Curated annotation (Swiss-Prot):
Residues 13-119 form the PRD domain. GO terms for biological process: regulation of DNA-templated transcription. The gene is yhfY. This is Uncharacterized protein YhfY. SUPFAM superfamilies: PTS-regulatory domain, PRD (SSF63520). InterPro entries: PRD (IPR011608), PRD_sf (IPR036634).
Amino acid sequence: METRLNLLCEAGVIDKDICKGMMQVVNVLETECHLPVRSEQGTMAMTHMASALMRSRRGEEIEPLDNELLAELAQSSHWQAVVQLHQVLLKEFALEVNPCEEGYLLANLYGLWMAANEEV
């Protein structure tokens, strides 16, 4: 995971501060939350988060996640914990995430949360 983030940084896809913050995110998710960040799904989620942070910094907008899908995810008993974790992770970064990115970030984090619970 660290290699991938460093490659994104070296290629200019993400800034150094975002790379450093993402290393912190990976550490928190792996050691404190026991989420499978080193899986294919985890790699995709971390890459997307880093890219979303850069898009937000650059003022680039994407289409938001479908509201119906987000509403369906929000019905989960785990949703509040996922939202709280999401907010904690974003505190690592000195930027405001574009609201269009929020749904995707939450969905990816939810997916990791559910994958971890399936493994138990």
